[in-house]
């Protein structure tokens, strides 16, 4: 018989930097999960990644207080900032540009992020990522 799922916890945790302080501690503590066990397992799985990379994680809590977690790829905004070399997006998106990004870089991001996106083709994924880039104040060049 399968374990009974009691809930899901969605968090965005920096790679290699999971610790019991907020937001991880309270989110897992509410479900009665072992916080340190998650932190150790997460840090072990993200040890080879660049430290500080934001990693979305979905934690599945079970009735016997055990858990499993699934890591996803970093958010599109992280890839866009890294590709364009900016620290943050434009404060006045649509009027001022914070940086530039090429269609080739957008295609590369779309191919990398494809498993996490809900689109059928790379072209559809590119359209979604271009929208995110415009929202961040990035100029899209040929």
Swiss-Prot record:
Listed Gene3D superfamilies: Ribosomal protein L11, C-terminal domain, Ribosomal protein L11/L12, N-terminal domain
Alphabetical list of SUPFAM superfamilies matching this protein: Ribosomal L11/L12e N-terminal domain, Ribosomal protein L11, C-terminal domain
Listed GO cellular component terms? cytosolic large ribosomal subunit
Give the signal sequence positions.
Answer: none
Please give the Gene Ontology molecular function terms for this protein.
large ribosomal subunit rRNA binding; structural constituent of ribosome
Q: Which UniProt keywords apply?
A: Methylation, Ribonucleoprotein, Ribosomal protein, RNA-binding, rRNA-binding
Q: Which GO terms describe its biological process?
A: translation
- Pfam families named among the record's database cross-references: Ribosomal_L11 (PF00298), Ribosomal_L11_N (PF03946)
Specify whether Ribosomal protein is a keyword of the entry: yes
Q: How is it modified after translation?
A: One or more lysine residues are methylated.
**InterPro entries the UniProt entry points to:** Ribosomal_uL11, Ribosomal_uL11_bac-typ, Ribosomal_uL11_C, Ribosomal_uL11_C_sf, Ribosomal_uL11_N, Ribosomal_uL11_N_sf
Asked whether the UniProt record includes Ribosomal protein among its keywords, one would answer yes
Tell me the SMART domains matching this sequence: RL11
Q: What does this protein do?
A: Forms part of the ribosomal stalk which helps the ribosome interact with GTP-bound translation factors.
Write down the HAMAP family for this protein, in alphabetical order. Answer: Ribosomal_uL11
NCBIfam families for this protein? L11_bact (TIGR01632)
Subunit structure of this chain's protein: Part of the ribosomal stalk of the 50S ribosomal subunit. Interacts with L10 and the large rRNA to form the base of the stalk. L10 forms an elongated spine to which L12 dimers bind in a sequential fashion forming a multimeric L10(L12)X complex.
Q: Which family does it belong to?
A: Belongs to the universal ribosomal protein uL11 family.
List the protein's name: Large ribosomal subunit protein uL11
Organism expressing this protein natively: Methylocella silvestris (strain DSM 15510 / CIP 108128 / LMG 27833 / NCIMB 13906 / BL2)
Name of the gene encoding the protein in the UniProt record: rplK
